[in-house]
Amino acid sequence: MKFAIDAFGGDNAPEAVIRGSIDAMQLNDDFSIIFTGDESAIYALLNDYEYDKSRVEVVHAPDIITCEDQPTLAVRRKKESSIVKALHLVADGKADCFISAGSTGAVLAGATLIVHRIPGVKRPALAPVLPTLKGPMMLIDCGANADCTPEYLLQFAYMGSAYMSGVLGIERPRVGLINNGTEEGKGNALTKEAYSLLKAARGINFVGNCEARELMSGDYDVIVCDGFVGNAVLKTLEGAVASIMTMLKTEIKSSKRASVGAMLSKNAFKALKTRMDYTEYGGAPLLGINGGIIKAHGSSDERAVCSAIGQARKLILGNVTNTISGLISREMEPQAGK
């Protein structure tokens, strides 16, 4: 396996990207890395580490796409950027998966324009895996498509099921649809029609509507929604977790008794923090693209980068792209036909 890594993507690049990549190489020896970015800067950082040089290549990319750039224009104009160069490696079959903590818009636009969608896939979807009370859950879509049709949501269900089955080994992943009630007739025009499609779909274990308060229950393995709703849900969860942690720290410091109690519960708090830490999950796969794409969090540190590479490895070993392709062509096209 070969991974094309945008060395200059993210708030902590390139240092965190290089360090996290070296750490990932020490964990598994079945992949190699192609860094894209300023060649001299990358080699200067690599010189600080001991690593198997036969597993690392560098492709010079002097330009950077920033979050201030208009994504589609930047992808078309900045052909020497680290994102564009890395995506071409995947498109040309020289790398199996692309990993970046850079501009989300540029990754989405570049993946679609350069690597292209899997035949039959109408829209790719950003699909982070999140912790719940009972295990991991995929939320799809989380921002790639603000406006969706019912057919898009049906395809998201197929793509999410393929990932959770291939990567996490979940047999017949339970699929839920975010809605404002659990009853079949609930929702707007989009969710009502999507419900009908999901209920009738072959190869999907659809278990019904999911209210927002049940997202973290662990009763669903894949939760489907349009990108506008998914992005709002994801950011609400991130903000809620951060606020709860802040309130908890404030209460702990409010009295000696609370501080002593916190010390006695230190291991439990540490375990909870680990479960809720995005660095443990690495990044969100962009599903529906004809090659592996992992979008890491913009503020990724070396731990998050290392986890993202581990996620890329599982994505490729799980044969997710081919599974999605087979599902879309075999299960959906004959019945949707749109």
Q: Language-model features: where?
A:
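Short beta-strand segments
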Residues: 6, 35-36, 59, 100-102, ...
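Glycine-rich phosphate/nucleotide-binding loop
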Residues: 112-125, 131-139, 219-223, 227-338
